């Protein structure tokens, strides 16, 4: 994509033209990925890096924290017409605990996902998920 396209996507996200962010998390086996471009299987692990990469836009002042959270949670739930995306009495308690300023280097070998392939290998980011809860139960906690 061109730099103009990249900037237009960020502007669209910031002003609400783009409603939601999705990772399209599609883990791929290393052998299936390490092929010439044409025959290589499409996909990459994304769930391990989604929050930190989105927080990059927040830290750079390109979108607000509120807008990022809306695009990652409330908007997808609304688009799909499913409950969720907010914390409310009697609702599903699906949420994450994270440290927005915690710095780390993306290293696929450390992913919890089934795949360790990432186009962001060795990329410095900020934002670390400490725990993920689904229906109020911890499904992931960082050691």
Which role does the model predict for each range below?
Residues 2, 29, 43, 106-107:
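Alpha-helix initiation/capping motif
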Residues 36, 92-143:
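C-terminal cap of metal-dependent C-N hydrolases
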Residues 1-4, 41-45, 118-125:
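A short acidic, glycine-rich active-site loop
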Residues 1-10, 79-80:
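Active-site glycine- and acidic-residue-rich loops that bind
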Residues 12-21, 26-101:
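His/Asp/Glu-enriched, well-ordered alpha-helical/loop segment
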């Amino acid at each position: 994509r061109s730099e103009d396209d990249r900037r237009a996507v960020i502007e669209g996200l910031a002003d609400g033209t783009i409603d939601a962010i999705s990772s399209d998390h599609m883990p791929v086996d290393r052998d299936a990925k390490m092929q010439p471009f044409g025959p290589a299987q499409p996909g990459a692990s994304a769930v391990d890096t989604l929050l930190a990469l989105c927080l990059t836009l927040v830290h750079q002042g390109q979108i607000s924290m509120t807008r990022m959270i809306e695009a990652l949670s409330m908007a997808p739930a609304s688009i799909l017409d499913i409950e969720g995306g907010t914390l409310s009495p009697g609702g599903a308690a699906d949420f994450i605990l994270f440290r927005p300023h915690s710095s780390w280097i993306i290293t696929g070998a450390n992913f919890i996902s089934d795949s360790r392939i990432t186009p962001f290998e060795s990329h410095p980011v900020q934002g670390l998920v400490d725990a993920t809860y689904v229906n109020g139960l911890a499904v992931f906690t960082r050691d």
